[in-house]
Amino acid sequence: MGGLTLFAAQGCKAPKQVAEQAEHPNIIYVFPDQYRNQAMGFWNQEGFRDKVNFRGDPVHTPNIDTFARESMVLTSAQSNCPLSSPHRGMLLTGMYPNRSGVPLNCNSTRPISSLRDDAECIGDVFSKAGYDCAYFGKLHADFPTPNDPENPGQYVETQRPVWDAYTPKEQRHGFNYWYSYGTFDEHKNPHYWDTDGKRHDPKEWSPLHESGKVVSYLKNEGNVRDTKKPFFIMVGMNPPHSPYRSLNDCEEQDFNLYKDQPLDSLLIRPNVDLNMKKAESVRYYFASVTGVDRAFGQILEALKQLGLDKNTVVIFASDHGETMCSQRTDDPKNSPYSESMNIPFLVRFPGKIQPRVDDLLLSAPDIMPTVLGLCGLGDSIPSEVQGRNFAPLFFDEKAEIVRPAGALYIQNLDGEKDKDGLVQSYFPSSRGIKTARYTLALYIDRKTKQLKKSLLFDDVNDPYQLNNLPLDENKEVVEQLYREMGTMLKEIDDPWYTEKILSDRIPY
């Protein structure tokens, strides 16, 4: 297990806490940042490799691999707007970026991008249902304001624009236990604000520190939770998010697994450019992947030792992926490429969810209602939620439920700015759709809002998206994709629908 001793002596087992099992199960949602679906070792193992048409990354993830064999594993979960804050807005609210309040990455120049105070978020629902709710790690869903609890009237950091943020109690949406921050990318020098607003600077690689705090919470050290209630835990780990360029960013024992490996044995995807400067980063990225696996394993082991594993739904996911030299792009995310959009989504619920692999096209706004459904709270899903509850499918693979035809792709950029440089609107630069077979993305000109670029890939015959198909040579396919995309954009009241963008092509 490395990095954390769960219990002092082998002969001293922790007290079983089965007595606290309630009508509703416990739930733990772990979502490391920028963790792509391909970066899990089990994809290269028997029982999994024949379920996908890509090669998994050569990563060491023993805990996730074991967990996968106990879980329902999705091959095609999608981060519809594959960027930190917009995904988190969708995750927490069950709404797309135009409704969640978070269309852009949150920083102090973007007052228009912040989680809505009036939204009924996933923590609100669990709290009202009698859960003890705890949030650990990165949040990155709030507009930073000068509200440093230790320095009133000041921001929590001096750099401009301000990215990091303190979330006061009235904005925590049902989470009664808090050990979190906005966003901060010094992985071995993290900081957190606790429930009472006190800052902690642990000087420890952040995923391992967070897993230790989760274990402490599970063991109820310091009497921090009500053991008569079921718990809902979210763990937002920052790695393997960049930076990934030195041992300041990962644990040396994890880096040692990759440091002597040739780059072409690590970056194995056919769409990779090994000549990119970023290529050397793969060793550190994979090291962080392995470190996250170790931290995740510590949480799983604690559940088992405490007798909580049988009545706890555990989900492993991410907010978006990482291109890592694929498609010759320096942008690790915010694109329709599979390395960016396709995220892990593994769900374990012993005795309730049969371990298997499924190709459900799960969208980010579907996660909140589905998680509530898994816990028997389907009737408590807020009316504003735009996502769908797919819990019946998790419980029964033969459930009569209409599967989604596709998942939307959304990219927004900064729009108009005021005289102080504050962003007052967002520009809906691209929309697209991912279906079981195709990926389509349309990009528009900022001034004319006319089509300036398109991407169309046959993901079945071209899984690494090497061949961008011309729209005019694939009219029948494109028209069907336009119809499906238009229907979905209309359903969520997206700006492309309200402004009738590219209405000469898309039949809204």
Swiss-Prot record:
<dbReference type="GO" id="GO:0004065">
    <property type="term" value="F:arylsulfatase activity"/>
</dbReference>
<dbReference type="InterPro" id="IPR000917">
    <property type="entry name" value="Sulfatase_N"/>
</dbReference>
<comment type="function">
    <text>Endosulfatase involved in the degradation of the glycosaminoglycans (GAGs) chondroitin sulfate (CS) and dermatan sulfate (DS). Efficiently hydrolyzes sulfate groups from a broad range of substrate size, including disaccharide to high molecular weight CS and DS polymers. Has a strict specificity for the 4-O-sulfate groups of galactosamine. GAG-specific sulfatases play a key role in the persistence of the major human gut symbiont B.thetaiotaomicron in the host gastrointestinal tract.</text>
</comment>
<keyword id="KW-0378">Hydrolase</keyword>
<feature type="modified residue" description="3-oxoalanine (Ser)">
    <location>
        <position position="84"/>
    </location>
</feature>
<protein>
    <recommendedName>
        <fullName>Endo-4-O-sulfatase</fullName>
        <ecNumber>3.1.6.-</ecNumber>
    </recommendedName>
</protein>
<dbReference type="InterPro" id="IPR050738">
    <property type="entry name" value="Sulfatase"/>
</dbReference>
<comment type="similarity">
    <text>Belongs to the sulfatase family.</text>
</comment>
<dbReference type="InterPro" id="IPR017850">
    <property type="entry name" value="Alkaline_phosphatase_core_sf"/>
</dbReference>
<dbReference type="Pfam" id="PF00884">
    <property type="entry name" value="Sulfatase"/>
</dbReference>
